[in-house]
Amino acid sequence: MIKQRTLKQSIKVTGVGLHSGNKVTLTLRPAMPNTGVVYYRTDLNPAVAFPADPNSVRDTMLCTALINDQGVRISTVEHLNAALAGLGIDNIIIEVDAPEIPIMDGSASPFIYLLLDAGIEEQNAAKKFIRIKEYVRVEDGDKWAEFKPYNGFRLDFTIDFDHPAIGKDVRNYEMNFSAQAFVHQISRARTFGFMKDIEYLQSQGLALGGSLDNAIVLDDYRILNEDGLRFKDELVRHKMLDAIGDLYMAGYNIIGDFKAYKSGHGLNNKLLRAVLANQEAWEFVTFEDKEQVPQGYVAPAQVLI
């Protein structure tokens, strides 16, 4: 049986909020089977819970933000959520003493190391997957994202920025998902932004924690980071990282073929909602026999690095 996963023990880290620029403490805790992924704002009394749910994603302008019916929010969840998807963590309590998850280095890599440091434990309950059964597509102008049936999790993402530092040869990335592929090919890709946009955001009191330490920054001509890129196509890899995190808002790893062109947090969420709203388009599956599991989901998360 392919089993659900949680952490072996709790672990804590301190970082900076991307938008506030303030110190943020993040605590990750084990959770019982079938708990799912639950975010908590512990700076509020009583603490406010945000179960991972695509319908709770109500702001996707600058990040993925969960907002409840009272207007309480928790922002910038996508990189941590991507790390959870990458390692197949089904059940976890995520506590944060601020309105946003710390940005760390702008990638999912620090969260991967944090989760592996806490240790991953299998639980005595069958892991549920969402299997795509029918073609689903959403569009927004020339942007689009789609799912097709596929026995695995395949991703194909294309970006299109008219910028001299983003050539045609670094605008597409394709990958067959596995924990190893995510850790080595995707998790280290950092978020990116354009200097003119960052200056405007900071003038509006946003992105105050943004810096060359936690983002790739481009001016009109080049990349400003002294150390350059971690991959020549780091930007499109990061957009794939974002998509993996956004799609894991379903709370389950997905079996299907995802393809996107110029998609962002909003369209990723729209696709996920469109899939789940169509009962014919998907089903829950579990696997009693490891031989039947799609290739990318076979390897245990403990053998990663």
From Swiss-Prot:
The lineage of its organism: Bacteria, Pseudomonadati, Pseudomonadota, Gammaproteobacteria, Pasteurellales. HAMAP family: LpxC. GO terms for cellular component: membrane. It comes from Haemophilus influenzae (strain 86-028NP). SUPFAM superfamilies: Ribosomal protein S5 domain 2-like. Its cofactor is Zn(2+). PANTHER family: UDP-3-O-ACYL-N-ACETYLGLUCOSAMINE DEACETYLASE 1, MITOCHONDRIAL-RELATED (PTHR33694:SF1). GO terms for biological process: lipid A biosynthetic process. Pfam families: LpxC. This is UDP-3-O-acyl-N-acetylglucosamine deacetylase. The active site is at H265.
